């Protein structure tokens, strides 16, 4: 059948459970939030925790249509599960799971005066998803027992388009 020769589906998935069996965190301690005089460090035992930036699931599925030797089109979807920004497994210091899809197409001009020309077009983040794929976290502790969590996120690009031209001679 026609679809067997022209359509390909690729998929992959990684499932993991990355843990620290007995985690102890060290935090800078300050006298108070007004003065911020450094008093040293304190430790806190968390027991078994998730390793930072280690999602439990990463998966992707791609659909490629190639009706001939010169043209192709590919749709790719990628899912990444929740990640923690540090090793404490604190929900407030985590990145939500996200799904992003990309579309690409290409055409090869095989016999030209300049040689072989490949023209490719990419539409990244096709669904224009707002998502975060990385970040940082830190905690300041105070002698009265209070804490401040500093959290920063690195949002990823919304929909963007890129083209590539390759000339082989």
Specify the residue positions occupied by each region the protein language model found.
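Residues on the lipid-exposed face of transmembrane beta-strands in outer-membrane beta-barrel proteins
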Residues: 1, 61-65, 75, 103-107, ...
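Gram-negative outer-membrane beta-barrel transporters
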Residues: 1-83, 87
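C-terminal beta-signal and adjacent terminal beta-strands/loops
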Residues: 7, 19, 79-84, 108-169
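Asparagine-centered polar/low-complexity signal
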Residues: 12, 102, 124-128
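Short alpha-helical linear motifs
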Residues: 33-36, 99, 139-145
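Short structured motifs
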Residues: 46, 88-90, 148-150
């Amino acid at each position: 059948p026609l679809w067997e020769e022209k359509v390909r589906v690729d998929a992959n998935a990684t499932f993991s459970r990355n843990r620290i069996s007995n985690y102890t965190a060290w935090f800078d301690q300050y006298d108070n939030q007004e003065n911020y005089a450094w008093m040293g460090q304190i430790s806190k035992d968390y027991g078994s925790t998730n390793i930072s930036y280690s999602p439990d699931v990463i998966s992707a599925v791609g659909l490629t249509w190639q009706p001939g030797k010169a043209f192709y089109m590919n749709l790719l979807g990628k899912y990444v599960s929740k990640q923690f920004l540090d090793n404490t497994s604190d929900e407030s210091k985590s990145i939500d799971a996200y799904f992003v899809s990309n579309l690409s197409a290409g055409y090869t001009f095989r016999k030209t005066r300049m040689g072989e020309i490949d023209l490719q077009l990419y539409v990244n983040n096709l669904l224009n998803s707002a998502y975060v794929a990385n970040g940082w976290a830190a905690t300041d502790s105070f002698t009265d027992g209070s804490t401040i969590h500093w959290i920063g996120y690195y949002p990823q690009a919304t929909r963007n388009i890129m083209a590539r031209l390759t000339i082989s001679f």
